[in-house]
Amino acid sequence: MHHAPYSSDEDDYGNTWKESSTNGDLKIRNISKLFDKYKVDFVFYGHLHCYEKSFPIKNDKYDKDGTYYVLAGGGGGNLEDFSPFPNYFSQKKFRGHHYLKIDISDKKLFYYVYDIYNNLVDYLELNK
C-alpha cells in the first residue's frame, strides 16, 4: 500500500498542534476489515518519511492475533515529525532513515529494522 491506514504523523491527517487528527487515511483504513477477515500478519506502506509499527490490531483495537501495520517510509527524502500526543495503536516510532529485513524460516518470521548505520531499531519474531 502507499497511504497510511494508521499514522502518528503530526500534520498529514490533521494538524495535531491545532486540531484533532484522523491518525491515518480513513478510506484506506476501511480495507483493514479484509485484513482482519483473512488474518493478514503485516501490512506495509510508505508515503510518510519515517518508521512506525503498530501493536497488532483487529477491529480497530489491540488484539494479539491482529495485524501489524508498518510505515516504512524512511528510505530517503525529508523526514516527518510525529504528533506530540500518544495514540492507542503505535508500538514503535523512529524518525530516521532506515530499511527493513525480513527472514522466514519454517514457521518463524524474523523482522528487523535498521538505521543507515546498521544499528538495530526494531525487532519482532512471529511464530505461526
Where do the PLM segments sit?
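Active-site-proximal segments of metal-dependent phosphoesterases and phosphodiesterases across multiple
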Residues: 1-42, 61-65, 80
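Divalent metal-coordination and catalytic microenvironments
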Residues: 2, 8, 47, 69, ...
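Catalytic metal-binding/acid-base residues of hydrolase active sites
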Residues: 4, 41, 48-51, 75-76
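Non-transmembrane, interaction-prone segments in cytosolic or luminal domains
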Residues: 5, 16, 24, 46, ...
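A structural signal for well-ordered alpha-helical segments within the folded catalytic domains
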Residues: 29, 33, 48, 96-97, ...
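Binuclear metal-dependent phosphoesterase catalytic core
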Residues: 52, 56, 60-128
